[in-house]
């Protein structure tokens, strides 16, 4: 049955109706920007317990708990309003709201980015509802409205948009992206908000109720495809994994092994496939086992360093998911930056699920199927 669905999705791609390709640019991460300005050490010192705190079971009215996107590198363009105003966003499968800075925001972070001006859009409607997004280092305050949102060739005339009126400065001031477009399930969206992809499905704006992601290691070449699967981005066959909780794109991982020995997730664990998180995050004790197995040593502020000269002798870390093994070689789980190497694994005891971020997605082309509530994975080209 899944093979038939794949054929339908590929056929839809060939017909190009209701198919949207959004090129993703691999840009400079916030970590790199802070490092270039000599600010990274102070940032890590002050926020070492909030670097990847994105996922939480706490829910409040019109609020979510998001990461500070310290290592996020993949961004795309969208347009809001009539006439359209351009924004660079993170297409984030780990959250569900769309928000961008507004002209009502005077924070330094907002002033450094594109800001939406409702007075210059003839289609904007104020909802008279507030939005609060809590970060580990402060909160983003905003308001909600409706407006036309354009993603490539898809025009959604009545989309909920969050407009920030206050942003935590040390989080977003130097980021290359303006805002976030969430692609998780509607149960994660703030009150009164409908996720962008849900609106597209409801209005039959996409050929299939799925989207797929390819993340290149190069600056160009990454792609988000709405409504189709593109076999030119992977080799072999897609393998399908049931979504266990329809909030995040969450599923069961059977185990994590190194050299055939279980080092983490013994007996199974829950994981989230998240395009808005760069690292591969898990419970502190499990991640510590992995760091030891790969020979990483802890730095001053919680990061784990690797000797760049040892990459060829380091082991492969294998995730077994739904009975299939997904190897991550050292080239995948090691971040190399200006002669320094760090581990792509990060411990976070505040998260109840593992988070498989860009470190994993660069290795495996990923399909997010809302029609069947499945995740598809195949070896990326």
Swiss-Prot record:
pH dependence (UniProt free text): Optimum pH is about 2.5.
One Gene Ontology term from the biological process aspect of the record: proteolysis
Sequence repeat residue numbers: 92-102, 274-284
Any one GO molecular-function label of the UniProt entry: aspartic-type endopeptidase activity
UniProt catalytic activity: Broad specificity similar to that of pepsin A. Clots milk by cleavage of a single 104-Ser-Phe-|-Met-Ala-107 bond in kappa-chain of casein
Domain Peptidase A1 positions: 74-378
EC annotation from Swiss-Prot or TrEMBL: 3.4.23.4
Disulphide connectivity of cysteines: 105-110, 265-269, 308-341
InterPro entries, alphabetized: Aspartic_peptidase_A1 (IPR001461), Aspartic_peptidase_AS (IPR001969), Aspartic_peptidase_N (IPR012848), Pepsin_A (IPR034162), PEPTIDASE_A1 (IPR033121), Peptidase_aspartic_dom_sf (IPR021109)
Catalytic machinery residues: 92, 274
CDD domains registered for this protein in UniProt: pepsin_A (cd05478)
Signal peptide: 1-16
Entry annotated with the keyword Zinc: no
Top-level EC class as recorded in UniProt: hydrolase
Prosequence residues removed at maturation: 17-58
Record text on activity regulation: Inhibited by pepstatin.
Keyword vocabulary terms for this entry: Aspartyl protease, Digestion, Disulfide bond, Hydrolase, Protease, Repeat, Signal, Zymogen
Biological role: Hydrolyzes a variety of proteins.
Oligomer and partners: Monomer.
Family: Belongs to the peptidase A1 family.
Protein name from the UniProt record: Chymosin
The species this protein was found in: Callithrix jacchus
Taxonomic lineage from the root: Eukaryota, Metazoa, Chordata, Craniata, Vertebrata
Gene label: CYM
């Amino acid at each position: 049955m899944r093979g038939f669905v794949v054929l339908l999705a590929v056929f839809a791609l060939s017909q190009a109706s209701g198919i949207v390709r959004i090129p993703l640019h691999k840009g400079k991460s916030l970590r790199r920007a802070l490092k270039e300005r000599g600010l990274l050490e102070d940032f890590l010192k002050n926020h070492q317990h909030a670097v990847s705190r994105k996922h939480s079971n706490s829910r409040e009215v019109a609020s979510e708990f998001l990461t500070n996107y310290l290592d996020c590198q993949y961004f795309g363009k969208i347009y809001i309003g009539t006439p359209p105003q351009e924004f660079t966003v993170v297409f984030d499968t780990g959250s569900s709201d769309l928000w961008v800075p507004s002209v009502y925001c005077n924070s330094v972070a907002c002033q450094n980015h594109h800001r939406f001006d409702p007075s210059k859009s003839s289609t904007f409607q104020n909802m008279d509802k507030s939005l609060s997004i809590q970060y580990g280092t402060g909160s983003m305050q905003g308001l909600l409205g409706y407006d036309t949102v354009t993603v490539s060739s898809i025009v959604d005339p009545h989309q909920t948009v969050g407009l920030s009126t206050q942003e935590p400065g040390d989080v977003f001031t130097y980021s290359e992206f303006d805002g976030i477009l969430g692609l998780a399930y509607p149960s994660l969206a703030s009150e009164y908000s409908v996720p962008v992809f849900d609106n597209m499905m409801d209005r039959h704006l996409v050929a299939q109720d799925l989207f797929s992601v390819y993340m290149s290691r190069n600056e160009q070449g990454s792609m988000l495809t709405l409504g189709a699967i593109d076999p030119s981005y992977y080799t072999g066959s897609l393998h399908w994994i049931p979504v266990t909780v329809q909030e995040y794109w969450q599923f069961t991982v059977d185990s994590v092994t190194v050299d055939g020995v279980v080092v983490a997730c013994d007996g199974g664990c829950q994981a989230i496939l998240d395009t808005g998180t760069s690292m591969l995050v898990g419970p502190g004790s499990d991640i510590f086992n992995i760091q030891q197995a790969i020979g990483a040593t802890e730095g001053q502020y919680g990061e784990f360093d690797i000797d760049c000269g040892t990459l060829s002798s380091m082991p492969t870390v294998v995730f077994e998911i739904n009975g299939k093994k997904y190897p991550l070689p050292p080239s995948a789980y090691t971040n190399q930056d200006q002669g320094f190497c760090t581990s792509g694994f990060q411990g976070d005891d505040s998260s109840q699920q593992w988070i498989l971020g860009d470190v994993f997605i660069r290795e495996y082309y990923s399909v997010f199927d809302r029609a069947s509530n499945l995740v598809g994975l195949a070896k990326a080209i």
